[in-house]
Amino acid sequence: MFRIVTDTSANLPTAYLQQEHITIIPFTFHADGDEQACLDLNTFDANTFYAQMRSGTKVSTSQIPPQRYLDVLNPMLEAGEDVLFVSMSSGISGSYASGQIAARQLREEFPARKLLLVDTYSASLGEGLLVMRAVDCRREGMSIDDTYTLLRSLRHRMAQIFTVDDLRYLRRTGRLSN
């Protein structure tokens, strides 16, 4: 048995996360300098977020810092649990790299424990589907190593397509460069 941890980008319902004992590490965003955590789909008000962007409020997102990973993962490893972290794509966020920094430190502190990070190459439901597959693997009794290997294989079999109404919002939040 192993713990599954992901970030809020997975967009999974809170009831599912609780039922399957999945821990979430939240992303944060800033609206006019005010930091707000995106904890889950129940507490994050997407309508307000997008209305703020449309009204000209300066909104920016930020990656999960290494310390937040340490705060969440350390107690799990300390309790003798192995952890599989399923992350948003490293291509659109630095959070996976932050997770790697924290993981290096934690592996030194807990050499007997396994801490494996999966870069999903996805976001939103693509990431969420891999989290759900990890839950299925755990339920079926697969090892953390076999689950990790499977997820790394499956991430190459997905493609995500999205559209936006206006590119300026991607530019404002740092998701689109000049």
Can you say where each PLM-predicted feature lies in the sequence?
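Mixed-charge interfacial surface used for oligomerization/domain docking
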Residues: 3, 9-17, 22-36, 91, ...
